[in-house]
């Protein structure tokens, strides 16, 4: 081994401080060196131990001066890979990467392999950083959803919104529409609005479930108005279906309120004959949104030619979808099928809203809707937590009336809603309570539309303290400030119970629900008790031990409710006499009219 080889081994991986050892650096030409014909002198200068052999002799006379110069011009010409095995990992140098000069003047040798590894590491860090950022973003969204009890199912889910101002930043909402929302008192979106609005704005079909009084109407009204953008003369471009006229009227009122100043023409079908002329084939088509019940719309569609055109509908919204999808007299499954077929536009999208999830509706949506997103707030089919719920055993049907009168004597905070099983029982209870000295009225399907509208208006205005009703008002109707709901007759299912008590405790306000039950209601108690317990309200221990009903038994109970004793305390003899007098009076009127005509 000569001095040249020794120097190469001693200098492997070393750093040279050019500033500190400038003389030596100049002498040994470290750094940016210009190699000339005197390269042999440089080699001689490295002969510290007086070894007189030339490089050519050492290399067997095969290496020329030009080859030596080429070797020195490569990176680390003075350095070679060590052939000895090393236990520790060290930086390896090759002869194809030039030396890098640090800012402090030192020279640091870097191999091409190491450079590639460093580049790969840097790229990996960048990649990891972007992945981490995306992961953090998703974690924040999941935390936000969990905080507000938002449960979402589907693919490629849109992010929820936290404020209505985000609609301006991300979706370019009309300034007037945004101002109307804020002026109406909606400062912060509710959980269902946080997720349902972005889903509909992305044009996705939706199945949404949220507790009663959680703002579902606004959740579909805002995206409809945003996506329609402005009024056009193409006919109806949005259709909202609800099970009752009272609920349809409420939705119509809310849509007009938040669309004020935007120019949208929002209509509701009051009388089918007038609607056929107004919306028929010869109409000007100067309308945008229609809110209606299924039966009135079906009547128009069956006309020849059809009394209404739905071929331009872009959004079909079904409110209280689980009720509308029911079979039998109380459901509208067949009517909905006809309405769906009438909406033939390729742009049509559908959204289903309800306070409860029905298995039939969910399965139908998965089979028939395209790339559907399912959104639910809180536990499925659960009662709203702002309602204090109580089960009250009254023994028999007679005990119900006694308990009702006891509540009146103790005093209550109106307004109060009282639910009964049938129209006949609603009339009977009304006649019993009218003599208790309280402002009471009744609403049911046998009353005229004008009477129903007047009753609802009086109840909203506070003129009526206690309103007796059937299941007609259990769906969707929003009465501001209802403090107490009394289930005079036990509901036929937990779903009906949830909708009934949902008339109180709305929009974050507190409310109370009292449910009377007798020995005859024992088969239905268990399912309702589970709902009450899930909401955090106490349930007697003995009720928890009751046997569960089979699904067939539940369906039978819903279709054929219990036969109950009459509420009326008036003896049957007097009731029959009153009926006879009524019939006699009607007959005498008919005779008088016939005489007048003759």
UniProtKB/Swiss-Prot annotation:
Question: Which cellular component terms (GO) are annotated to the entry?
Answer: nucleolus
Subcellular location(s) per record = Nucleus, Nucleolus
List, for all copies, the residue spans of the domain called Helicase ATP-binding.
Answer: 197-375
- Chemical reaction(s) catalysed: ATP + H2O = ADP + phosphate + H(+)
Give GO BP annotations, semicolon-separated: maturation of SSU-rRNA; rRNA processing
Q: Does the keyword ATP-binding apply?
A: yes
Q: What is its EC number?
A: 3.6.4.13
Question: Where is ATP bound in this sequence?
Answer: 210-217
Q: Which major enzyme category is it? A: hydrolase
User: Motif DEAD box in this chain: where?
Assistant: 319-322
Key words, A-Z: Acetylation, ATP-binding, Helicase, Hydrolase, Nucleotide-binding, Nucleus, Phosphoprotein, RNA-binding
What Gene3D superfamilies does this protein map onto?
Answer: P-loop containing nucleotide triphosphate hydrolases
Superkingdom of origin organism? Eukaryota
Motif Q motif: which ranges?
A: 166-194
Describe the function of this protein.
Required for efficient ribosome biogenesis. May control cell cycle progression by regulating translation of mRNAs that contain a terminal oligo pyrimidine (TOP) motif in their 5' UTRs, such as GTPBP4.
The record's similarity note reads:
Belongs to the DEAD box helicase family. DDX52/ROK1 subfamily.
Identify this protein by name. Answer: Probable ATP-dependent RNA helicase DDX52
- Originating organism: Rattus norvegicus
């Amino acid at each position: 081994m000569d001095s040249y080889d020794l120097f190469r081994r001693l200098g492997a991986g070393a750093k040279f401080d050019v500033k500190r050892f400038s003389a030596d650096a100049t002498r040994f030409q470290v750094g940016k060196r210009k190699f000339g014909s005197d390269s042999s002198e440089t080699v001689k200068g490295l002969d510290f131990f007086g070894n007189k052999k030339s490089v050519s002799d050492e290399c067997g006379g095969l290496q020329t001066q030009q080859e030596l110069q080429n070797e020195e011009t490569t990176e680390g010409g003075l350095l070679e890979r060590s052939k000895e095995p090393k236990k520790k990992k060290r930086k390896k140098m090759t002869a194809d990467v030039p030396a890098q000069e640090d800012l402090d003047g030192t020279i640091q040798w870097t191999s091409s392999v190491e450079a590639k590894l460093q580049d790969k590491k840097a790229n990996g860090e960048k990649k990891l950083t972007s992945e981490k950022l995306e992961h953090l973003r998703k974690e924040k969204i999941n935390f936000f959803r969990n905080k507000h009890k938002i449960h979402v199912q589907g693919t490629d889910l849109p992010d929820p919104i936290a404020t209505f101002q985000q609609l301006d930043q991300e979706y370019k909402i009309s300034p007037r529409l945004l101002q109307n929302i804020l002026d109406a008192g909606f400062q912060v979106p509710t959980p269902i609005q946080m997720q349902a609005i972005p889903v509909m704005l992305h044009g996705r079909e939706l199945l949404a479930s949220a507790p009663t009084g959680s703002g579902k109407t606004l959740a579909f009204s805002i995206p409809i108005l945003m996506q329609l953008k402005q009024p056009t003369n193409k006919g109806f471009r949005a259709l909202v279906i609800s099970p009752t006229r009272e609920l349809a009227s409420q939705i119509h009122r809310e849509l007009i309120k938040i669309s004020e100043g935007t120019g949208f023409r929002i209509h509701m079908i009051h009388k089918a004959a007038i609607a056929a002329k107004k919306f028929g084939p010869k109409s000007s088509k100067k309308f945008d949104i229609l809110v209606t019940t299924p039966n009135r719309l079906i009547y128009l569609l069956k006309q020849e030619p059809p009394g209404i055109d739905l071929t331009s509908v872009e959004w079909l919204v079904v409110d209280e979808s689980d009720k509308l999808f029911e079979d039998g007299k109380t459901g509208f499954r067949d009517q909905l099928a006809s309405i769906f077929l009438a909406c033939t536009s390729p742009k049509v999208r559908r959204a289903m809203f309800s306070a409860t999830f029905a298995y039939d509706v969910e399965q139908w949506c998965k089979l028939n809707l395209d790339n559907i997103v399912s959104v639910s707030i809180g536990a499925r089919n659960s009662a709203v937590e702002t309602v204090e719920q109580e089960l009250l055993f009254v023994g028999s049907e007679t005990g119900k009336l006694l308990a009702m009168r006891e509540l009146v004597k103790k005093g209550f905070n109106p307004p109060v809603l009282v639910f009964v099983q049938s129209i006949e029982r609603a009339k009977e209870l009304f006649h019993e309570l009218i003599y208790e000295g309280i402002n009471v009225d009744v609403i049911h399907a046998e009353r005229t539309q004008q009477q129903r509208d007047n009753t609802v208006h009086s109840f909203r205005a506070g003129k009526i303290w206690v309103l007796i009703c059937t299941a007609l008002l259990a769906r969707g109707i929003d009465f501001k400030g209802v403090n107490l709901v009394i289930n005079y007759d036990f509901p036929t299912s937990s779903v009906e119970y949830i909708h009934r008590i949902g008339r109180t405790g709305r929009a974050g306000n507190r409310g109370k629900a009292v449910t009377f039950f007798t020995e005859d209601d024992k088969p239905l108690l268990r399912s309702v008790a589970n709902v009450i317990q899930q909401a955090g309200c106490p349930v007697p221990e003995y009720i928890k031990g009751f046997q569960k009903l089979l699904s067939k038994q539940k369906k039978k109970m819903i279709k054929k409710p219990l036969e109950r004793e009459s509420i009326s305390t008036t003896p049957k003899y007097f009731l029959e006499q009153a009926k006879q007098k009524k019939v006699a009076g009607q007959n005498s009127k008919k005779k008088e009219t016939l005489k007048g005509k003759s």
